[in-house]
């Protein structure tokens, strides 16, 4: 999505020294959240991302990247590494891995959103949800979306969270594409349309090193 937007450049980063000063950092999905978070921690990538966040850079987490942003990851059944692991601590939530994998189509609507996603408030979307485990919020966070149905079964659940300034954002389903487009547009406006640079950690970066 980002790569198709004029004025936006995307760079895939495998080393902390390559991170630089981007306008946005995207943590993508992964098939092994705990193992890849351990790689980020050992390589210095986590520290570099946290430093950028402290300086005001928005962080966007998708799927496994979403799970990394919380306080703790717990894997009592050994689905991934087993045991527990400290998260990046950017969002007050815990993730619990389970053996059951969720795969479903979803329809929903954005709630009232602040910051770089404010233009999406009230917009409808459709997409998919695929993940293992559940992420549970421990604090007063802004919800991004309301899911009206899973495979046409209404249950009105909520998905995606953001901190108070929408500087740390997490999304677990098909609303991701609209989020990416809106973030690019708003960050470019904030930078007087001078262009935007995004750093994205590639999926499975640990294994490809």
Name these PLM-found stretches.
Residues 31-126, 134:
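Cysteine-nucleophile active-site neighborhood
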Residues 13, 17-20, 53:
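A short, aliphatic-rich alpha-helical micro-motif
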Residues 10-11, 15, 105-171, 175, ...:
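C-terminal and late-domain segments of enzyme folds
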Residues 1-11:
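Short helix-loop-beta junction
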Residues 25, 88, 130:
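Hydrophobic, well-ordered secondary-structure elements that form the walls
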């Amino acid at each position: 999505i980002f790569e198709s937007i004029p004025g936006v450049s995307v760079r895939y980063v495998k080393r902390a020294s390559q991170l630089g000063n981007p306008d946005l950092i995207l943590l993508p999905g992964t098939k092994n959240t705990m193992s890849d978070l351990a790689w980020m921690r050992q390589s210095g990538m986590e520290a570099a991302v946290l430093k950028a966040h402290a300086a005001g850079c928005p962080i966007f987490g998708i799927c496994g990247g979403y799970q990394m942003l919380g306080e703790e990851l717990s894997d009592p059944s050994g689905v991934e590494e087993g045991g527990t692991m400290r998260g990046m601590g950017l969002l007050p939530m815990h993730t619990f891995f389970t053996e059951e994998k969720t795969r479903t189509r979803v329809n929903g609507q954005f709630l009232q959103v602040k910051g770089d996603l404010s233009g999406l408030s009230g917009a409808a979307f459709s997409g998919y949800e695929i993940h293992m485990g559940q992420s549970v919020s421990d604090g007063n966070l802004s919800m991004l979306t309301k899911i009206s149905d899973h495979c046409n079964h209404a249950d009105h659940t909520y998905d995606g969270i953001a901190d108070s300034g929408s500087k740390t954002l997490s999304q677990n389903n098909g609303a991701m594409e609209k989020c990416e487009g809106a973030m690019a547009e708003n960050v470019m406006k904030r930078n007087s349309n001078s262009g935007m640079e995004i750093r994205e950690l590639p999926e499975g970066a640990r294994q490809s090193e």
